Amino acid sequence: GITLPNRTGLPTTMIRSYWELGDILHFDPDTARRNIELGYYDTRRAMGYLRGCAYAVSTDARSCEDAAAFDWKFTRLQKAVREKYPVTLTADAALLLANMKDAQLAPLEAAAEDAGVDPTVFYTTRTLAEAFLEKCDRERIESFAPLFEGSGNAAQAARAALLPNTFLQALVCRALTGPVLPEVIEE
């Protein structure tokens, strides 16, 4: 990277890609094409035209509403599961380790990255969610379903703790596809 200080006095914005860009000494047209696309999106993000950290996500009103709705569902689901099975806190650690800056999209982006969603595509919150659902291993993450339904056991909770990234994918999948959590109504 650039290690010399900026002595010109001109405003400068350093842009660092979230993604590994590959070996610059070995020229490959596909890698160059990918790096150009990622660089374009990184620049647009730095200028405030895109949101997200790892993925280029639209800042239009609909996409922002979808991100807020996803965040609302995800937060409530995560809280409900954590209260019943405290050992599942490791999903929080997986999210922190992903180091995503956009709090509303962070779980979706981290899960999409783990699932192998293409970062060189422009997404809305909805299309990123669809791409994640298409790429994720549904059979594997559905094994965590009893934890969301309240019928899980200690072994399943321990498995969630041992596989925090997979459990994070399961949380995201459930937030995207599952029912809205019922509110507790006291009479």
Where are the regions a protein language model picked out?
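Patatin-like phospholipase
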Residues: 1-187
